[in-house]
Amino acid sequence: HQEVYPVLTPMAVDSSRPFPLIRNKSLNIAALLQNDKTGDEYEFATVQVPSVLPRLVRIPSKHEKDITFILLEQIIEKNIDKLFLNYKVVCASPYRVMRNADLTIEEDEAADLLTEIEKQIRKRQWGEAIRLEVEDGIKDRLLNYLVDNLGIGNEDIFNISGPLDLTFLMKMYGIEGFDNLRNKPFKPQPVV
């Protein structure tokens, strides 16, 4: 709580706050909220999983040899109700948006090609949404809200059974005490 809570930025969507721009390849938690006062209105909210914290969180154990991890997004999802006071969290689920990263540079029209390339690279984070990864079992109402607001077709939705964005697994490779599970380094034969 002390490490994660201060770096979270929950964003709720309502009539005065439009659907936020979701950064390319960022991991987020979507939530459907019910107002405690009205009881019948549903609101959408999203929280980006902070990249400044490690995605794998080691859970302390009584036994030194027992090593257990939990994913940061699971911690956030299970405690998301603490971010939205006066709301009941109806459902929550992780998602990730992939955006079009193509560069469209008119070389003939660009006065300064380097400046134009830099500008286009900055825009890549906010291109058109072309893929939506969601955790298998996401509630239909939550999925439909994401699809409608991102402008994604059904063929661009990928239900993932397991964690989204597996790049974090490389961090597990360096964990001490598991040398027997690692492949031996490959040594190429010298050139004769």
Positions of predicted regions on the chain:
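N-terminal localization/anchoring segments of enzymes in phospholipid and broader phosphate metabolism
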Residues: 1-192
